[in-house]
């Protein structure tokens, strides 16, 4: 779980973010969304301190996580509707149809994920590497594929703000969701010995980098290629 959480967040920012930045010339960031990015950065730093030091995340921390998550969702739902997303895009579909599509997509994702995890476990035996390494690379890359597809679709529709929200939401969900599941299944979890020092610091640095990119609205093919190359270098390093 630890490798998947950190690896997926790193992949979302370096790989998915790199793909997102390649075709666009300008990031559309609304002022109302800046507080969301600040929340992401603050919580990423808070989570970094939980994994860099020998701190057991137990039920008390889980309750705090849930409380923060409720506040986050409440604040996000109170925001005005994005003008870039017109109601005409959803008027032609009933609410029931949309719900059915979401449920069907979730079921496909759930069962495909089970097979993917089994495949990933077999790779640990084939390559003789630790499960954490597989989690940070193969499993994390697999869990980031939906973000890649969603990002490409968002860019095609010329809605870069959706692509950014996709990365942001996925990373926040990873931190909250995976940690909460681990705590409820095992009563507590300690990431200290589950991640290398490089994994921990790269998690923090990529979170800071993502914050700087969106707040300063940085774009360009050079930045895009640099992010992707950084991810490929990190990916290769873990198997050296």
What are these regions (language model features)?
Residues 1-240:
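Hydrophobic alpha-helical segments, chiefly the membrane-spanning helices
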